[in-house]
Regions:
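Extracytoplasmic soluble-region selector
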Residues: 1-112, 179-183, 189, 743
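Short glycine-aromatic motifs
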Residues: 4, 43-53, 441, 690, ...
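Sequence signature of WD/YWTD-type beta-propeller architectures
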Residues: 91-682, 710, 741-745
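Secreted, cysteine-rich disulfide-bonded mini-domains of extracellular proteins
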Residues: 679-746
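Extracellular/luminal Pro/Thr/Ser-rich low-complexity repeat and linker "mucin-like" segments
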Residues: 12-28, 110-112, 166-170, 291, ...
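Low-complexity, Gly/Pro
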Residues: 6, 12-20, 27, 31, ...
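Surface-exposed loop/turn positions
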Residues: 20-25, 68-70, 161, 167, ...
Length: 746
């Protein structure tokens, strides 16, 4: 052979035991049949490493921590040859929670732990159980039946969910006629064979303690370390080119007999969701600021804006302070956040004023203590739910009240405002907008790249948004003007639409469509019987609104959501008769970047969270329940769903949703904004380029196994900055909103 050659040439498949670095593979390079020194590299340092050289040979060593396809590259001058190694990772078996610190955090030792932070492991439940006895292990390994007679089924998660990497392990919840269990077996395996693990767990000891919310073994988390390995493995490329999906199998044992397994198959997006979700919380335990108001057990009540970062097991306080029992001046709830994550606008309670919720404050999220940066705007009643540009340099104001009883708005027309230089100076200057004179915009929202504005045209309607159309206008940042206003949607007669949110590539808009008004509010709310669904339409073509059926819970044969009492579809009565949990979704917002080839929508839902949050949908007023009792936890929570990009008009690009981990179980949570965190400087630890000020997250020169922010790169990896697709290392990537985005394997 006259050219450069790397041997072995074919696909190499190796079986690796978790935690081991064997077997290794030796590669050699020749030119015209003679050894030649080349530069060696691998594409995924989490899978393996190669001695870099230059040398005529290298040894590829698996990390023992992740399975999947590893690409080995040999470069000589301008010529590069690639070879592939498929690593099949054996995760082994375990019996009971291990001593791994991540699993110890998922093990409850007291009843009080069940209601702290986001619950055990950030997802609720009673945590991992201990070891299973020998006879029950046999029952789990040789089940007496498949569980169909006992009606064994999953309540949560949902089949066909798309998960990102880096999230907390979900809480597996099941239902069956036995109503209790002695032990369970969980099995995780990828469809390609890149990973396999099996674990058995006895009934958690906390279920036998006084004060436990239940005595039944009806839910269990997946061990966090196992989940991280499984999701870091699934979602990659495979030898046959098919998606590497993740299957979960559950077998349940009671009375010496096992039943099952029941199974689900999920997809995993090959990316982490970085950034922070900022959201409203009514009933948070992090502050107390409702004046002289307590819950049914005498706890003072708090309302604040909280934040959750990927991997957190509980939220952190962002804006809001304790002021009870004397006053409610510490309350901060209604808010908007700039998509690049730098600034937040919030409204404050003003007890002495004729109207409440009229004062607006700007907060710098780049500060370690955002509350200390509060700048009060000189114009009250102007900035509630305004639309901010990605860098928060300008805001376009909203004219719709947050609710009929929450008069935060004093203006009837909208305007574009500058915040001064720098933002936070408090100098407000109204600017000409180029939109129709006197326009009143409801629920306005800028596209992540600031090129478009969507809003509900509420001009002249006062506080009633019924029948108001939804418009989109182009925006020119250079001149701060709008143009080309188009109506993209008009809701069915007698209903309302709102909360438009652009996809990261500006290709479509998601929004909330009212299904049934609660009869007392003239604007869109999430309370007192208001029912809504999330819809979308594709821009650039004849708009065709479509319900996101997979997101709201509608499958090919109807709703796939679990049903239950308390007006959750099983025994609905009165005005709730005929409705189910597929009409309990509200307030969508979208992560401003593409991750793993998907867009990601955050929304409020009052659906059942398996068998963990099962109260009546509207029972989220903190005065009506015990804020320290997980069995009374309201269903008003934040959920996340993946959205396909490049979907044709009229199709459903959504996937089943998952519960956002780390929310306080006993609080009612809503209006989540998933935005990028303030960027990190070069040399700072990172997970992806969208976290870095210069856009690159590269191996640390002094410690190649670690990643740090950088200002240089040969090309851009997924979630690193780009101007065109040609900047991306993978030529199949797109350049969306300034970052390289992969395309999911179909």
């Amino acid at each position: 052979m006259n050219g450069l050659d790397i041997e072995p040439a074919g696909l190499q498949t190796i079986m690796v035991t978790l935690g081991q670095n064997t077997p290794t593979i030796a590669y050699t390079a020749t030119l015209a049949g003679q050894p030649v020194s080349v530069a060696w590299s691998v594409d995924r340092g989490d899978l393996g490493s190669a001695v870099a050289g230059p040398a005529s040979s290298t040894i590829v060593t698996p990390t023992g921590g992740t399975g999947g396809m590893l690409t080995v590259s040999a470069r000589l001058g301008t010529t590069t040859i690639k070879r592939q190694v498929f690593i099949q990772l054996d995760g082994g078996t375990q019996n009971g929670a291990s001593m791994n610190p991540l699993e110890q955090q998922q093990t409850a030792t007291t009843v009080a732990q069940l209601g702290q932070g986001g619950g055990i492991g950030g997802v609720g439940g009673e945590g991992l159980g201990g070891a299973v006895d020998a006879s029950t292990l046999t029952a789990l390994a040789t089940p007496a039946g498949n569980g169909s007679v006992q009606m064994l089924s999953f309540l949560y998660p949902y089949d066909a969910t798309v998960w990102p990497r880096g999230m907390l392990a979900p809480l597996l919840m099941w239902n069956w006629s036995q109503g209790d269990a002695d032990a369970i077996q969980i099995e995780l395996l990828t469809t390609s064979g890149s990973y396999h693990w099996k674990g058995t767990f006895a009934k958690p000891a906390v279920l036998g303690m006084t004060g436990a919310p239940t005595t039944k073994f009806i839910r269990s988390p997946i061990p966090q370390d196992v989940w991280a390995t499984a999701t870091n493995t699934a979602g990659g490329s495979t030898p046959n080119g098919k998606p590497d999906q993740l299957t979960v199998k559950l077998t349940v044992a009671i009375g010496g007999q096992g039943f099952g397994p029941v199974s689900q198959t999920w997809s995993v997006a090959a990316a982490r969701l970085t950034g922070t979700v900022y959201y409203n919380s009514y009933g948070t335990q992090l502050v107390q600021n409702w004046s002289n108001i307590q819950d049914t057990a005498g706890h003072y009540i708090g309302a604040a804006i909280l934040g959750i970062r990927s991997g957190d097991t509980g939220p952190h306080l962002v804006v809001g302070a304790t002021s009870a029992p004397t006053d409610d001046s510490g309350c901060r709830v209604c808010h908007v956040v700039s998509s690049r994550g730098r600034y937040l606008i919030a409204q404050a309670e003003q007890p002495a004023a004729p109207n409440l919720d009229v004062t607006s404050f700007l907060y710098d999220l780049n500060d370690a203590n955002p509350q200390a940066t509060a700048t009060q705007f000189t114009t009250n009643g102007t900035f509630a739910w305004a639309a901010m540009l990605s860098d928060a340099s300008y805001a376009y104001t909203n004219v719709i009240e947050p609710s009929s009883t929450n008069p935060a708005i004093s203006a009837t027309t909208s305007a574009l405002y500058a915040f001064g230089a720098p933002p936070g100076s408090g100098v407000l200057a109204a600017i000409s907008t180029g939109l129709p004179t006197g326009v009143g915009a409801g629920y306005p929202s800028f596209a992540p790249d600031d090129q478009y504005l969507a809003y509900v045209d509420a001009t002249g309607t006062g506080t009633n948004t019924q029948n108001c159309p939804m418009n989109v206008a182009a925006y020119d940042a250079a001149t701060q003007t709008f143009s080309n206003v188009k109506t993209i949607y008009t809701p069915p007669m007698g209903t309302r639409a709102g909360y438009p949110a652009f996809l990261p590539d500006d290709s479509g808009v998601l929004f909330e469509q009212e299904v049934r008004n609660n009869g007392s509010d003239t604007v869109m709310v999430t309370r007192s019987g208001e029912r809504s669904q999330i819809e979308w339409l594709k821009l650039g073509v004849s708009p065709m609104p479509v319900v996101l059926r997979n997101l709201v819970g509608i499958g090919a044969s109807g709703s796939y959501l679990p049903t239950g009492g308390n007006q959750h579809g099983l025994d609905n009565t009165g005005i709730e008769a005929g409705y189910d949990d597929t009409t309990l979704d509200y307030e969508p917002t979208v992560l401003p970047i593409v991750a793993g080839g998907y867009a990601w929508v955050v929304f409020t839902s009052r659906r059942l969270y398996g068998n963990q949050c099962v109260t009546e949908p509207w029972a989220s007023v903190p005065t009506a329940y015990n804020l320290a009792d997980p069995s009374q936890a309201p269903t008003k929570k934040l959920w996340v769903a993946a959205i396909d990009l490049n979907a044709p008009a009229g199709s459903d690009p959504s996937h089943p949703a998952f519960y956002l981990p780390a929310q306080e179980l006993d609080a009612g949570n809503s209006r989540g904004f998933w935005v990028l965190d303030p960027c990190k400087t070069d040399g700072t630890s990172c997970a992806s380029g969208d976290q870095c000020c210069n856009g690159y997250c590269q191996p640390d020169p002094t410690m190649p196994a670690s990643l740090v922010c950088s200002n240089t790169a040969m090309c851009s990896n997924v979630q690193e900055k780009c101007t065109t697709p040609a900047d991306c290392c993978d030529t199949t990537n797109t350049c969306t909103n300034g970052f390289c985005a992969g395309i999911p394997i179909q």
